Amino acid sequence: MIKKSMVMAAGFGTRMRPLTLQIPKPLVQVLGKPLIDYSLDFLADAGVEEAVVNSHYLAELLEAHLSVRTSKPKIIISRENAVLETGGGIKNALKLFDDAPFFVVNSDVICINGKTPALHRLWQAWDDAEMDALLLLHKVEDAVGYEGRGDFFVGDDGVLRRRTQQETAPLVFTGVQIIHPRLFTDSPDGAFSLNVLYNKNLARVGAVVHDGAWLHVGDQTGLTQAENWLKTNKNSQL
């Protein structure tokens, strides 16, 4: 089982304004609990021992919150002088990881486990010889707080295909994944999206469809929907 992870937490959270004018988005509370604590607890519940958290916007506030957190996982900060986006942020932190796969979790989602913890399912499906990344996907029709047109199709052979600009896809990327550092071979410097690397290496990107719930807390509408879902499903495994 993978013991190391990264939590993406450096962005400006512009879609969550005005809440994020005073605090970084990872500290926005969902039923009284900061978003990032849902992500960290999700990792800890799966046995992950260490989480690298990238920070930039209102970094001091985020880091102060993390510094007084006493529960697992152990936190290591990767401060960014400029926002590096998803790809650049992870590449900037690779020095903190071994040459081995690690989990990555976005800090603006709440992932509710199904019968088997989602991270365990990802690890069971990981094929180091065939994969550089393994994405946890979710059915668009079952997503909470997500209003987009999906990201991927998965064929009967398990092969991923991105939707075209005109299409609507049945599966959305949850922001939860396994990445191997070799995905970043010959990658750009500075700020860039992970989508650049997915598109370049799609044949080595796998997928698992999540069997639990997924709450996308991208804006205030998503926040309200997430809180309503959690109130209605109090016995769900967080």
Predicted ranges, named:
Residues 57, 133-151:
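Short beta-strand-to-loop element that shapes/binds the nucleotide-sugar donor at the catalytic cleft/hinge
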Residues 16, 62-66, 226:
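Hydrophobic packing residues within well-ordered alpha-helices of enzyme cores
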Residues 1-7, 33-106, 110, 186-189:
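Conserved N-terminal catalytic core of the sugar/cofactor nucleotidyltransferase
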